[in-house]
Amino acid sequence: MIESFSVKNFRSIKHEQTISFLANNKIQGSSDTYVLNKISDSVSLLKFCILYGYNASGKTNILRALDFLRSLVVDGTTGSDTGTGFEPFTLDETTTQEPGTFALIFYIEQIRYTYRFIVDKKHFISEELTYQPMGRKALLFRRTHDEGTHISTVEFGTKCGLSAKERATLSGNTVDTISTLFAYQKSNIHSVELELVVAYFNHVLKPVVTPNTSVEIWTGRVGQSEMIPLSNILLQRSGLHIEGVRVSEKNPAPVFQHRTSLGFHSLPFDEESQGTLRYLGLGTTMLDGGVIPIDELEASLHPDLVAFLLQMFLLNTTGSQIIATTHNQSLMELDFMRNDMIWLCEKDEDGASEYYSVQEFGLHKRISIGNAYRAGKLGAKPYLGDPTIQL
């Protein structure tokens, strides 16, 4: 579970920006039992955050920044001459020469971790992982880079669980362009604490789900034994008049069973609607759980289906979260939606993306967020010119 994610100098993001899942304890609703993950008596994390903004405002870039952090842990780089893949803010000559800063605060088994690093196009400048096993901050490792010798040094805390030999191995394998956590996975050494963290990045924090990848995820897994029963449940509850989907050893391509007044009609996969496939891709991904970034949540889907998917996720998962971008304003009006769940994005005069929460406006709970947004009182919407065109 994520508490917050911060990034500075990445793509359209110039100044440090933070997206937080930390629930405001002053906001209470009847849906809190299933929209919140309770960490302690004083800390609860939201299971869902949604991000609005006009086109080209930079909504997707906060997801890309989170995915960049994840990929440096999970995928690393292929060689010392390939660089890190870092993309700075390019509308300012100064920032193009500066590094980016990334920080993720997250929980594993109720224990709070903080992972942060500073990186440029060529190498990691610093990297640190801390945690709070007994409520007190403890160092797992801290990495620094000597600009003169171009050598990275890794300092380990007493809680890291590595022998002196293993520490030397990991430090030696941590070359300029890869993260310490990626180097750990390639070093044939073992630390209980580091294993938990790399498992989190490999299995809990998911890659960004896009309109295309959501379909690919489903088609790539449709042959798994549990996927057909789950897909059939989703289809039968969708109102799409589809009874189910089947595959066979002779014909592994999915075939959809449509229900009509004349009986059932089989429709092959390549003739099924994009909306149906995306619904299945998103639905099965959501029910898998984890921390799921989703770009263009509403793509190819009716607003009622989107709302149904979100309710299904909230009611049937624990310890999971979604952060999604959308233009679907009707989601603002859903019964379970809280002010601290809704984030807005717009660009400043320098063309840099800024992200802020609706709760910062202090709206009364009886005020319609959707109406306030449509009226332009919350920003993050396009101000359009005269539609009349004379050539």
Q: At which residue positions do the language-model features occur?
A:
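Switch/communication elements of ASCE P-loop NTPase nucleotide-binding domains
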Residues: M1-V73, V255-L391
